[in-house]
Every structure is written in structure tokens, then in C-alpha cells.
Amino acid sequence: MKILAISDVPSKALWDYGTREHLEGIDLILSCGDLPQKYLEYLTNFTAAPILYVHGNHDGSYRENEPGGCICVDDSVYVWKGLRIMGLGGSIRYNNREDSFQYTEREMRRRVRKLWRKAHHVGGIDLLLTHSPAAGLNDGNDRAHKGFACFNDLLEEYQPKWFVHGHVHLNYDAKLPRVCTRGGTTVINATERYVFEIPDPDPLQKRKFLWGSAKK
């Protein structure tokens, strides 16, 4: 299964030219947030691959106008062709803007707890999809780009094979890795775009579930 992860910065290769060519062979698109609605909608015209997304902290406009043809998996456990995905968008709260997706550590921890039963129902998760990184795991030094400590707890409890996030642009720090590992989890910073491949999930799990607030 070939997956395209995108976040924060629209890719010129996808947005301006060669879109169909760059999406050829892509089975699934994961958006980690902070991308214009029209960008995601544009991509739907050139691929049959589902586009799953969580909200970034700057996606306040999504409250009034969610991107058409895409699937919101925020606050959800979504299973696609056997791949179990937990979605948690937003960033740490760093100002008082009410139209943005910002959360305190306590608020995010509460969101995580609400997903426990859904994750248990499908036997765990394979991929954690978020906007922010985990605390101390390639997050930023400033308040706005600090990661969530509860994401470390998620990685410890569920041990997903993949953790895909955005928020911390790679050009913020030359030492930030695009890909690293934490235990048995491959951690991917999806800033702009990144393509990776995973084995096809267990065919016994190839059923489609939609839980929580996920919607199309």
C-alpha cells in the first residue's frame, strides 16, 4: 500500500503542475492539517485514493466549510482496508483564538480517553495521525510548537507501526528528521509531502468502519 502524507505547506509539484503524475499509484492520502480546503478538493480531481484528514491549528475555516470529497477522521478510529487509523488534530494551546483547533494538555488527554473504547473495539491501531508531534519527539522549542505528552502515552500503550504528524516545518530546524523511529514505531513528519509504503494489512481486517465524529 502506497501512502501520500501531506501537511502545512501545499506542494508545488501537486498544486501547480504534474498533479496526476505525482499521484499515480497512490492508494491513500493522509493530511495532517493546516492546508487550504481548496487544495484538498483539488487533489480529489486527480486520484481515486481516499483523502483522510485531521485539523491543524490554523484550520478554523473548516468549521464552516469542510473540504468536499474528503473524510475527516479527527476524534475517530477509522479502518480502511484493514488499516486502523486514530486521528487527533490540533496543536497545544498557545493563544486565546477561539476559531482555531488548539487544546491544553488536559483537553487533549480527554480526547484520547474518549477514543479508547473505539480503538479497543477494532483491536488497537496501526497508524496514529495527528497535527502536532509528541512532546520531546521532534517538537519545537517555542510554546506554539510543543508536542503533547499524552501522545507518548498513546505510542506506549498501542505501539502503532506508524505515527504521522505535521505542524513543525522541517525548515524550522536543520536537525529535524523527516523520518525517525521510536521503539517499533516509524515517526514521519509530513510537512509538504512524503510518500511511504506499508505492507497490505491483514485481509481478515479488510472491513471499513467509521467511528466517532468522522464524516464524509
At which residue positions do the language-model features occur?
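Conserved catalytic scaffold of divalent metal-dependent phosphoesterases
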Residues: A5-L14, H55-K146, S213-K215
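Active-site environment of divalent metal-dependent phosphoester hydrolases
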Residues: P10-L14, L35-E41, N57-R63, R93-R97, ...
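A generic local structural motif
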Residues: L14-R20, Q37-E41, I71-V73, R113-R117, ...
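Active-site regions of enzymes building and remodeling cell-envelope glycoconjugates
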Residues: D27-I29, A48-Y53, E66-S76, R182-I188, ...
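A short, gly/pro- and small-residue-rich
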Residues: T47-H58, F148-F151
